[in-house]
Amino acid sequence: LLEEIKLKKIKFNGVSSDSRSIKKGNIFFAIPGNEIDGSRFINQAIKKGAAAIVVPSYSKKRYPKNTTVIKAKDIRKSLSLLAFEINKNNIETKIAITGTNGKTSVAYFLSYLLRISGKSVATIGTLGNSVLKRNKYNLTSPEPIDLSKQLKKISQKKIKYLVMEASSHGLHQSRFYGMNFDVCALTNISHDHLDYHKTINNYIKSKMILFKDYIHKDSKLIINSKTKYIKKIRSILKKNKSVQPLYFQANRNYKITKILIKNDIQHVKAIVGSKRILLKFKNFPNFQIENFIFAISILNLIGFDPKKLSKSSLNCPSVLGRMEYVGKTKTGGKVYVDFAHTPDALKNSIVESKKLETSNVHVLFGCGGNRDRKKRPLMGKIASKYADKATVTDDNPRYENPAKIRKEVIGNSKNIS
């Protein structure tokens, strides 16, 4: 694309994929979306002074006279490459985390561990941009133009480490194509986003793109082997002999060996990088302990001492909305908030709550509208099976009837209202 721009001697001052925000001299990318085709807005972009229009190579539409049109084989990848070429950054170390559950927690723990190690770090993900304090479009993985601008600003602040959540949508849509990460990590894969990916196989393949298109020759790869689809993951990655990931919990040098609770303190033994480490936590569910040690393992792959990092475990704050303790009821019951939006995450939250508390567990939850409907009855069954009491409420119904969503969640489940 850059070669064609040079060949056609196109003078431009930026790129845009949104005709509403395009400025005179921008190159407009007419991206075909799931619901809206960007080619519908080409005339609007031209009227606003677009320097050129980029369309998919298969497009056979006619365009207004005197319009410079460039055809791209993969329009999304072309947009990302050009955006990152325009907004260059010099962040030294980049870490990407993908997975159904645990991305935000691992990113949070990585940021915490890097900061206590005296390193400057920025995180981009579900909770927004930790440095710029924004999440303009409420996306885990921002669109390429926005992301490239964010990274440039982060770089200008002399920040050396980037920790980024890589969503399946972001990977499938090539939102950060052109970036190469020093560490690529996978937390787990379970049922989610099938409204978009249609099948679990498509979903897994989207996650695996991180280990194919976003690595350089010295990249470190790590995967938590305690995931339901580990055999499928291994079979996909085996096809590329240059990809040799480390499997956390299946590798004798990277695993948790013991968790013991004494006086409300969890004492944990683990091995990271062949070093035996001891950690202490207070009111941490087991899956968060696993995420914390997974984060230590990631940093060990790029030279950090796990023994030094492990000393900070007891003082680590809980992650916002991840089995986060928020207070007590009038009768003394402890209240935890967890952003469990998948069947596996809901099960983990309830099971871990029972480990932390001796009393009954009452779960209050809901499912979002206009999203994966298949998981609704699954979550209802899980709540019914594992909680002592379950109540279904509304959780951003969007354009769906809230009562219909609640009915689908409850399904044939018992002890749930």
What is each stretch, according to the model?
Residues 1-81, 85, 228, 278-280, ...:
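N-terminal leader/targeting and accessory segments in enzymes
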Residues 21, 264, 273-389, 411, ...:
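Nucleotide phosphate-binding/pyrophosphate-handling subdomain across enzymes
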Residues 42, 111, 151, 207, ...:
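Generic hydrophobic/aromatic pocket-lining and core-packing "Φ" positions
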Residues 53-63, 334, 377-417:
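C-terminal helical cap/extension that packs against the catalytic core
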Residues 64-73, 135-138, 240-246, 257, ...:
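Active-site regions of enzymes building and remodeling cell-envelope glycoconjugates
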